[in-house]
Amino acid sequence: VTRFSANLGFLWTDRSLPDAIRAAAAAGFDAVECHWPYDTPAAEVRAALEETGLPMLGLNTRRGDVAGGENGLAALPGREAEARAAIDDALEYAEAIGALCVHVMAGVAEGADAGRAFVANLRYACDRAAAAGRTILIEPLNRFDAPGYFLDTTEQAADLIGTVGAPNLRLMFDCYHVGRTEGDVIGRLRALRPLIGHIQFAAVPDRGPPDHGEVDYATVFAEIAALDWDMPLGAEYKPDGPTDATLGWMTTLR
């Protein structure tokens, strides 16, 4: 039986984060995850998690100046102080709510200086997270949805994980992003399995529910199970209506 995590950055966005956690529990999800929870008091989130018994798998570092086109800070040369403050904030919030992982967002950048900044900031994040037993995640984003994002392929992510050399740095493997950029989702899952810390999914190419599109998720989920993966898979898709009306796939794909 496949277990699923509701990504509350996309699901039940018409509700407060605590109420979205409750909705995910009522719908039969096994875990939750979120994007940027910082506007919600951590105590309210923790209370909803304790009430429902759902684990919070992860959250993202802040993106920076979103209106100005920023999409993360950790690979921006000269912005190390801001990047590390964002990492500290994320780890502090994760500690307060009991979240397992923090996704460190690289940002829109390119070149060797950006690579060096990202490696240094990831080492900082991993050192800080290790003390609390947390995992740091990095995620390649496809170039159609996130043009200019520093990290856009799984190969680049694998190289970064090797360079940083921290045992608690892992790949967030989003089948949607990999499907858009690289294809061969199952082949990449098999090749990268030792590096993966979390798996997400959505239909390719429209990022809708996983019951349609170019990727056959029944096959993908069976392959993931065959790879001895037992953590909940992150449903990070964009509902084409009220979230509760888009959950038929949970029955057919579980």
Regions found by a protein language model. Give the residues of each.
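Active-site acidic/histidine proton-transfer and metal-coordination neighborhood
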Residues: 73-170, 180
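Active-site-proximal loop/turn and secondary-structure-junction residues that shape catalytic pockets
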Residues: 10-12, 38, 61-65, 106-110, ...
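Conserved beta-strand positions in the central sheet of alpha/beta enzyme cores
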Residues: 33, 58-60, 103, 137, ...
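Histidine-acidic metal/acid-base catalytic patches
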Residues: 1-5, 10-28, 89, 98-99, ...
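Active-site gating loops and adjacent loop-to-helix segments of metal-dependent hydrolytic enzymes
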Residues: 66-74
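Anion (oxyanion) recognition and catalysis
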Residues: 25, 50, 95, 130, ...
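A short beta-strand-loop structural module common to alpha/beta enzyme folds
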Residues: 30-39
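Active-site-adjacent beta->alpha loops and helix N-cap segments on the catalytic face
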Residues: 39-48
